[in-house]
Amino acid sequence: MKELAAELRKYKQVFVVCDRNVEGFAREVTGLRTDGRSGEPGGLLAITADEAHKTIDTVMQICRWLLEMGADREALVLAVGGGVTTDMAGFAASIYKRGIRYANVPTTLLSMVDAGIGGKTGVNLDGFKNLLGVIRQPEFTAIFPEALQTLPEKEFRSGLAEMLKTFIIKNPSHAYERTVAEGPLPELIQMAAGIKQEIVEKDEFEAGMRRKLNLGHTWGHAIEWRLPGAYSHGEAVAIGMVQAARYAERFGIAEEEGLAARIGKDLKACGLPTELPCPVSELLPAIAKDKKAQNGQIRLVLPVRIGKVVVKKVDPSTL
C-alpha cells in the first residue's frame, strides 16, 4: 500500500471511483482524504457495479461527478473494484475533457488477470456486451492479492475461468495444469496477468493476436445477453470455451485428442459450468452482433491444444 500511496503523490488530483461493495477497502488502500491536498485523493464515488448498471448512464454519472468535483485535465481517476468498475471508470476518464488519466486497483480475480489489464474500457448497449467503449491504457494497475480474501465464491470461480482461458492460450511451465490442481496461487496470478500484458503490448488495438484473448467470449457474451444475471462473466466464458473446443474438433483442427472433454472435465473440477443453458439458435442474435463480427462472418477463437489457439472466420448460421 505504501507503493500505491507513493504513486498517487505524483498526481495533482486523484478521484476514486469504486464498487460500493469495496468502499472500505478503497478508503484503506488510498488513505482517502477530502481536503484536496496535492497528491491525496480528492473524493470518492461509490457506484453500483453490476452488468445491469454497466451503461452509458453510469458513465455519465461519473463524468458529472468529476465535473462537480472540479477535476481538470491533470487529474487521475483511480478505479477500485472488479471488471465492471474498471471498465466504466476507465471509459469515463477516456471521454471526460477528451481524456484524462486513470489507473486500476482490481479487487476480483477476474479483474486482476483480465479486465484490469489491457486498456479495454466500455459499457453494454441494450444488453449487448461492451458495444460502446475505447481502448485506453491505464497509468498503472496495482494488485493486492489480500483483496481476494473476502471475494464471494461465485466471483472467485469467475476469475478462475479467465485464468484458465489465459493458460489455454499460452501455457508456460504447465501453468494450466497447476491452476487446475492448486488454484490461483499468487505467482500464477502474476503469470496470467503478464501473459495478457505481453499480448496487449504486441497488439494493443486487437488487429491480430489480441483477438485470441476472446477465447470463449463469443458464446459467453451471448449467454450473458440471453440470460442476464444467471451466470457470472467467467461462468459464461467457461461454457464458451468448451463450445470452442468442440468446434475445433468438429472442424478437424484440434491437435490434442479429447481436447473438449479434457477442458470440460477441468472446468467442472473447478466448480464451473460447461454446458449451454439454451439452444444455440437462441444465442444467434447476440453472436451476430458480436463486436468481432465483420462482413457477415464472426471470428471464432478455437483451442487446438492446451497452450495454442487459432482464430477462424465462420458464418454464424453454421453454429
Residue ranges of predicted features:
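ATP/NTP phosphate-donor binding region
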Residues: M1-L76
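C-terminal charged capping/lid subdomain of soluble metabolic enzymes
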Residues: F15, A161-M163, A254-L319
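Non-catalytic interfacial helical region
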Residues: C63-V80, D87-N104
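Generic secondary-structure signature for well-ordered alpha-helical cores
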Residues: E68-A71, Q137-E153, A161-I169, S173, ...
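Short glycine/serine/threonine-rich phosphate/pyrophosphate-binding segments
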Residues: V84-F91, M112, A222
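A glycine/threonine-rich phosphate-anchoring loop and its flanking beta-alpha core
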Residues: F91-V180
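Active-site segments that bind and position negatively charged phosphate/pyrophosphate groups
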Residues: V180-S281
